[in-house]
Amino acid sequence: METYTGIPEELKFAVLERIQPTEPEREKLFAIQEELASQVKIAAEKLGIPGVLVKMVGSAARGTWLSGTHDIDVFISFPEETSRKDLETLGMAIAREVARYAEHAEDRHAEHPYLNITYKGFDVDLVPCFRVASASQIKSAVDRTPFHNDFVKPRIKGHEDEVLLLKQFMRGGGVYGSELKTQGFSGYLTELLVIRYGSFKNTIYAACSWKPGEKIDIMQHGEIEHEEPLVVIDPTDPRRNVAAALSLDKFCTFIDHCREFLKNPELSFFFPAPILPLEDSEILEKLESRKSTQLAVVFKTPDVVEDVLFPQLYKMEQAVAALLKEYDFTVIKTGVWSGNTETAVMMELISGTLPNVKKHIGPPVWVKVHAEKFKEKYQAADGVFGGYIENGKYIFEILRKYPTARGLLEDRLMSCSLGKQVHQSVNEGFEIIENAGICRLKEYDFRIYLRKWI
Amino acid sequence: METYTGIPEELKFAVLERIQPTEPEREKLFAIQEELASQVKIAAEKLGIPGVLVKMVGSAARGTWLSGTHDIDVFISFPEETSRKDLETLGMAIAREVARYAEHAEDRHAEHPYLNITYKGFDVDLVPCFRVASASQIKSAVDRTPFHNDFVKPRIKGHEDEVLLLKQFMRGGGVYGSELKTQGFSGYLTELLVIRYGSFKNTIYAACSWKPGEKIDIMQHGEIEHEEPLVVIDPTDPRRNVAAALSLDKFCTFIDHCREFLKNPELSFFFPAPILPLEDSEILEKLESRKSTQLAVVFKTPDVVEDVLFPQLYKMEQAVAALLKEYDFTVIKTGVWSGNTETAVMMELISGTLPNVKKHIGPPVWVKVHAEKFKEKYQAADGVFGGYIENGKYIFEILRKYPTARGLLEDRLMSCSLGKQVHQSVNEGFEIIENAGICRLKEYDFRIYLRKWI
């Protein structure tokens, strides 16, 4: 077992100095929250909509936001008996009324529509919700949020800095954010970890020994089994795993980040040095030293939000890897990158070419009907090099249909099961670039991605 | 299910015409057997060795030899109570006395020494054995043979032609011969099949539906379980499987040969067209069309009999394939060929080269002690391209030690577990030839082997 050196207080101060909201920042945020709350009330009155309450939720409301983030979540709460239709139309009417004073407004859609506005420089979500009796009786996913707020706020009081440290530490490790692109830790999850373990430090120490199946149930009320690597039962809903979005690899990356940090507690675990984009010459050097085959399937970035796009890209990544494996190519790794205009599914292969001859293994000779059918089929087929018996099975050496990965993808990519928007975009056209060809992709962010890739 | 067309009588006649010993051939063989028998008796008397009997065994004694084969087995039978030492010295003394009239004599050794002589153009084995009460009480493996003779001779009478047909059919299919090179059917096994099934035709029909584990127990006295694909309990020894030497692939090759024959009963199944040696130009053509990598490990043929050599070659074939797989090369197939001067272990690979980068998969991150050790080791190692977490496991991209199969074999072949004589020979020197390099091997028999190989 490692013996860890502990976390110096000076380090924590140095981090907090950079992430704690300043007093003027706090005052401004609170003032804006007040303003928005009264705007909602005024709008409801003006539109003659009764029973509306305003709830400030999220990290802004709980004092756990990182300095520099300007997100405010305003929940417009309707009586439980309101119909879905009324919730949507009346809720959005109020939101739009508030938006009259905003610099910018945009309709968004989760389970229900909501309005995202820019208000005095803040990024504000105006979200209609039902006011239900408990989080286990919610009518819409967003109804849960006010309960989270009620649970966390009193318990986190005095520990806000610990949450800030943990959030920034997770950012530094690339595991902060529960959106479907990142599949990491949500803000609420971070708060629950601090409530459970008492501090940033204790969370880090505990995580070093986490295993998949790790379970945290603060209220001791979990009702069902969960399959995810980390199970944190929602204190406001015994059936929900707050860490359901956390992938196994992000779970492990966090464990690794904690262990490395405790071995050598440094500022860089919170604020890693920026990654420099890879130059053409570096790409060529790396290709030459690895001598593997790099392949990228490049297509126009579909015009959808990341939470829709990335699950489709991850699905495509799996499908492409499966296709390559099915046709005998050995995949070293796969990845996805998506920029403003172009998106790439990346693959590294042992080799992009295979021999023309393919060993096709048939059924055992003694499984008579199958074996005879198999033999008849291949004996008479075109391009058969030869046949023999090995380990009791018929083997035919047949002509490989796709001796190059490029040819395979060009011909069969569209037969992969792809998500709707990705399918559309790929169907409009895609390009397969290989090895030095990837120098064609110049986007700064792609070149940063490449430095991690090769 | 196939419906077979039956076996035309004319076909059988046509085959028998070529393999049935002619009357003069039979007379001559019988005369020579008589001569040898009396030679043995005279020798025993002359040397003053009492209790010696002569037993003519083998196909010559049972009338089931193929025309043109001139093998005679003369067993010199001693009383059971004879010591091993006496059996060997007295038995060989008698044999040597007989050998005085031979054109050529050569000491050979199975479990005991015996003498192989050429006598009036016949290939004769003079084999000392114990005269035991039953085959289950044998003192030496050869003691069993006279019992085989006693069992087969009366039962095969009148069916000798059926045995001849089956033997020749197996020859045509490359499955006749129980020596360790061939791992096929022995003559005795062929006779037992005809006794069991009644005829050549019935044997062929039955074999079409054989499965591994097929059991034939004519005397219904089998005592132990056998693992081999075909189990034919020795009628003279309930513990012995007569088909123990038959490999799974030869078992299957025979099944296949039977099925194909019944689909299209032709003379070529008994007398296949000779295989022509592959010319250099054909080798190059085939390499170009297959585009795989051919490798041959070539060394001086060890000076031992095939029954010693081939098990060692098969073992080497396995060991080399395992070595290549261990280092990530994909083996399509392996084979061995052995000529008078040179021997080659053949391998066909997807590719003889691999990238420099090798994906090294470590333990899951949560298996703390192992995972941390693994990470520490590779993080600090030379030639590491990078590391990441995938499916919960640490992955390091390390520098591949052997990016070519040739380099691997040159460096590590001697670390393979090799048989004694093969080890000696390989240790004295070996050559690795690749692709067009195999044109260097000119032996006629190798070029015939090559035509089957590629």
UniProtKB/Swiss-Prot annotation, chains A, B:
<dbReference type="GO" id="GO:0000049">
    <property type="term" value="F:tRNA binding"/>
</dbReference>
<feature type="binding site">
    <location>
        <position position="59"/>
    </location>
    <ligand>
        <name>ATP</name>
    </ligand>
</feature>
<dbReference type="InterPro" id="IPR006116">
    <property type="entry name" value="NT_2-5OAS_ClassI-CCAase"/>
</dbReference>
<dbReference type="InterPro" id="IPR043519">
    <property type="entry name" value="NT_sf"/>
</dbReference>
<dbReference type="GO" id="GO:0004810">
    <property type="term" value="F:CCA tRNA nucleotidyltransferase activity"/>
</dbReference>
<feature type="binding site">
    <location>
        <position position="125"/>
    </location>
    <ligand>
        <name>Mg(2+)</name>
    </ligand>
</feature>
<dbReference type="InterPro" id="IPR042090">
    <property type="entry name" value="CCA_tRNA_nucleotrans_2"/>
</dbReference>
<dbReference type="InterPro" id="IPR015329">
    <property type="entry name" value="tRNA_NucTransf2"/>
</dbReference>
<dbReference type="Pfam" id="PF09249">
    <property type="entry name" value="tRNA_NucTransf2"/>
</dbReference>
<feature type="binding site">
    <location>
        <position position="59"/>
    </location>
    <ligand>
        <name>CTP</name>
    </ligand>
</feature>
<dbReference type="InterPro" id="IPR008229">
    <property type="entry name" value="CCA-adding_arc"/>
</dbReference>
<dbReference type="Pfam" id="PF01909">
    <property type="entry name" value="NTP_transf_2"/>
</dbReference>
<dbReference type="GO" id="GO:0001680">
    <property type="term" value="P:tRNA 3'-terminal CCA addition"/>
</dbReference>
<keyword id="KW-0548">Nucleotidyltransferase</keyword>
<keyword id="KW-0479">Metal-binding</keyword>
<dbReference type="InterPro" id="IPR002934">
    <property type="entry name" value="Polymerase_NTP_transf_dom"/>
</dbReference>
<feature type="binding site">
    <location>
        <position position="148"/>
    </location>
    <ligand>
        <name>CTP</name>
    </ligand>
</feature>
<keyword id="KW-0460">Magnesium</keyword>
<dbReference type="GO" id="GO:0042245">
    <property type="term" value="P:RNA repair"/>
</dbReference>
<keyword id="KW-0694">RNA-binding</keyword>
<comment type="function">
    <text>Catalyzes the addition and repair of the essential 3'-terminal CCA sequence in tRNAs without using a nucleic acid template. Adds these three nucleotides in the order of C, C, and A to the tRNA nucleotide-73, using CTP and ATP as substrates and producing inorganic pyrophosphate. tRNA 3'-terminal CCA addition is required both for tRNA processing and repair. Also involved in tRNA surveillance by mediating tandem CCA addition to generate a CCACCA at the 3' terminus of unstable tRNAs. While stable tRNAs receive only 3'-terminal CCA, unstable tRNAs are marked with CCACCA and rapidly degraded.</text>
</comment>
<feature type="binding site">
    <location>
        <position position="71"/>
    </location>
    <ligand>
        <name>Mg(2+)</name>
    </ligand>
</feature>
<feature type="binding site">
    <location>
        <position position="62"/>
    </location>
    <ligand>
        <name>ATP</name>
    </ligand>
</feature>
<dbReference type="InterPro" id="IPR011068">
    <property type="entry name" value="NuclTrfase_I-like_C"/>
</dbReference>
<dbReference type="GO" id="GO:0000287">
    <property type="term" value="F:magnesium ion binding"/>
</dbReference>
<dbReference type="Pfam" id="PF21133">
    <property type="entry name" value="CAA_C"/>
</dbReference>
<keyword id="KW-0692">RNA repair</keyword>
<dbReference type="GO" id="GO:0005524">
    <property type="term" value="F:ATP binding"/>
</dbReference>
<keyword id="KW-0547">Nucleotide-binding</keyword>
<feature type="binding site">
    <location>
        <position position="167"/>
    </location>
    <ligand>
        <name>CTP</name>
    </ligand>
</feature>
<feature type="binding site">
    <location>
        <position position="148"/>
    </location>
    <ligand>
        <name>ATP</name>
    </ligand>
</feature>
<comment type="similarity">
    <text>Belongs to the tRNA nucleotidyltransferase/poly(A) polymerase family. Archaeal CCA-adding enzyme subfamily.</text>
</comment>
<feature type="binding site">
    <location>
        <position position="62"/>
    </location>
    <ligand>
        <name>CTP</name>
    </ligand>
</feature>
<feature type="binding site">
    <location>
        <position position="176"/>
    </location>
    <ligand>
        <name>ATP</name>
    </ligand>
</feature>
<keyword id="KW-0819">tRNA processing</keyword>
<dbReference type="InterPro" id="IPR048833">
    <property type="entry name" value="CAA_C"/>
</dbReference>
<protein>
    <recommendedName>
        <fullName>CCA-adding enzyme</fullName>
        <ecNumber>2.7.7.72</ecNumber>
    </recommendedName>
</protein>
<feature type="binding site">
    <location>
        <position position="167"/>
    </location>
    <ligand>
        <name>ATP</name>
    </ligand>
</feature>
<keyword id="KW-0808">Transferase</keyword>
<feature type="binding site">
    <location>
        <position position="176"/>
    </location>
    <ligand>
        <name>CTP</name>
    </ligand>
</feature>
<keyword id="KW-0067">ATP-binding</keyword>
<comment type="subunit">
    <text>Homodimer.</text>
</comment>
